[in-house]
């Protein structure tokens, strides 16, 4: 981060940022998952909440997620500039000054936490504040560059939204919200390691110690299978709570069987096989992992609607 910042401060540049560039700082793709899982947390929580309070909670949870994204893009500008997948992001692409990304992230952090606390309760606001801190400071500034287990520990940051949504309604944390957290937490490693299998060169060039870089692809394949196996009981465990019904049970059984099969297929392959078909299996599993979370949380939403009928 320091090298990139030094470059941007010592060499005058012409910035040509539009609204879309500033919006991109908020990582809208990541935000969509945050909003959806937080919304499910709100809608399945007991007691219910008025539509206005629910909308307000989602708005400020989304802003908090966007704040995390902006702070991450500010700090990771040097890494993003090297990686093909991220080189076109607003800061490394020269669209938005790094200082503006930092300022935007800090302001949105303060506003989102304060307003969520005032609109709902300070338990939810405290969880949001911790999430922003964990992602921007613990993960982005430390774990990501320090350990191959960065996404295992750092995955906690992306796992909090349903718990925050739940707390916005109930003012507390329950087993159901912990299990919703756990699903995302255990899903994160196999999801990102599947990506890292076919983007190893990118991470290596950027100096990011992903597991594929430090331990090799063979060990990464083994860890994908291990974490996918560990994910299954967490996902199915939610059936034992009040929020999951028949739609979730069927969805979880089918999705986890597919994900397990994909993880097994990745594990049994060697590099010659993967290179021969352009990492087709790894890419297929990565794409399915994106669908996996939406299907699980969508099923919870359908069960909640079913109970109202």
From Swiss-Prot:
Its EC number is 2.5.1.141. Pfam families: UbiA. Keywords: Cell inner membrane, Cell membrane, Heme biosynthesis, Membrane, Transferase, Transmembrane, Transmembrane helix. PROSITE patterns: UBIA. Its main location: membrane. One of its GO terms (molecular function) is protoheme IX farnesyltransferase activity. It is an enzyme of class 2 (transferase). InterPro entries: Protohaem_IX_farnesylTrfase (IPR006369), UbiA_prenyltransferase (IPR000537), UbiA_prenylTrfase_CS (IPR030470), UbiA_sf (IPR044878). The chain crosses the membrane at residues 30-49, 53-75, 98-118, 123-143, 151-171, 178-198, 224-244, 247-267, 285-305. Belongs to the UbiA prenyltransferase family. Protoheme IX farnesyltransferase subfamily. NCBIfam families: cyoE_ctaB, PRK04375.1-2. Interacts with CtaA. Carbon 2 of the heme B porphyrin ring is defined according to the Fischer nomenclature. This is Protoheme IX farnesyltransferase. The gene is ctaB.
